[in-house]
Regions:
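Domain-scale signature associated with acetyltransferase and cell-envelope carbohydrate enzymes
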Residues: 1-274
Length: 274
């Protein structure tokens, strides 16, 4: 979806009648075939772009919910086609949200300032007093981590590797976060500076800060009830659930962490379980 238009006066009046407010209605752009019927009790501020709200979501138990915006506050947000965003306690700020994404009963989702979404975080592996830090990023491999941790007698190599990672992290830094297509975020708390890939499911997470959830259609990521994470990367096909607490961690592909597991300054590569 690339073409937008301003709201018509009739649409503005209809939105007002549906208890919507805006700091400036001129800052809102909508898809060419936008219909305001399914937008109610919503507050807009900053730059807003809205797609269409056609279609329904079929939830567990057969419950159906129509796409739309209900009881939410959006600030500097782009919403794709066919999304349902409902019952956001505080607000969503500085995000691009993809198509057919379902967000319900969350506290707050925001990006505050420029974020690198977990890229470039130094993880103190092997020696908890430091000296063998590994810089995590979306493309980290076990081989690269091994060299960074154990080849400290090659300082030129280590500095070059750090420079490459810093460059990647800076290139991916942004003041705008991303929530992909077909994402589900429900019954969750505080989500700040987190990039969320396609088809991810976040159900009941307590707090997620400064991280990347690198989910995709073929290998989705699940973040479950009570999870608390900060300074992290979660790779494709992994699940983190059942009250896991983790900080400064890289979680590789197809890993499973659960049962109140706790981790700090740790690297989990493919197929690990905790």
């Amino acid at each position: 979806m690339s073409k937008y238009r301003k709201l018509t006066e009739t649409e503005i009046q209809q939105l007002k009648s549906q208890f919507c407010t805006a700091d400036n209605w001129d800052d809102i752009e909508v898809a060419l075939d936008f219909n305001p019927e399914h937008v109610s009790y919503t507050r807009f501020s900053g730059t807003i772009k809205l797609g269409t709200f056609d279609g329904e979501f079929i939830l567990a138990g057969g419950m159906k919910k129509h796409a739309g915006l209900y009881h939410t506050t959006l600030h500097n947000v782009t919403v794709g086609n066919g999304c349902c965003i409902e019952n956001v306690k505080n607000y969503i700020a500085n995000y691009v949200i993809g198509d057919y994404t379902f967000i319900e009963n969350v506290d707050i989702i925001l990006v505050d300032g420029e974020s690198r979404f977990g890229n470039g975080v130094e993880v103190a592996v092997l020696n908890e007093t430091g000296g063998r830090e590994v810089m995590i990023h979306d493309r980290l491999s076990a081989h690269q981590a091994y060299i960074m941790a154990l080849y400290r007698h090659r300082p030129v190599l280590i500095e070059r590797m750090k420079a490459v990672i810093e460059k990647y992290a800076d290139e991916n830094a942004s003041e705008i976060g991303y929530i992909g297509n077909h994402v589900t975020i429900v019954d969750s708390g505080y989500i700040k500076n987190v990039k969320i890939g396609d088809f991810a499911k976040i159900e009941g997470a307590s707090s997620l800060k400064n991280g990347s959830i690198n989910s995709n259609e073929n290998a989705s990521v699940h973040v479950g009830v009570g999870v608390i994470g900060e300074d992290f990367i979660i790779s494709t096909g992994s699940s983190v659930e059942d009250g896991v607490t983790f900080s400064k961690c890289f979680i590789g592909q197809a890993c499973h962490l659960g049962h109140n597991y706790s981790a700090t300054d740790s690297l989990f590569f493919c197929n690990c379980q905790g």
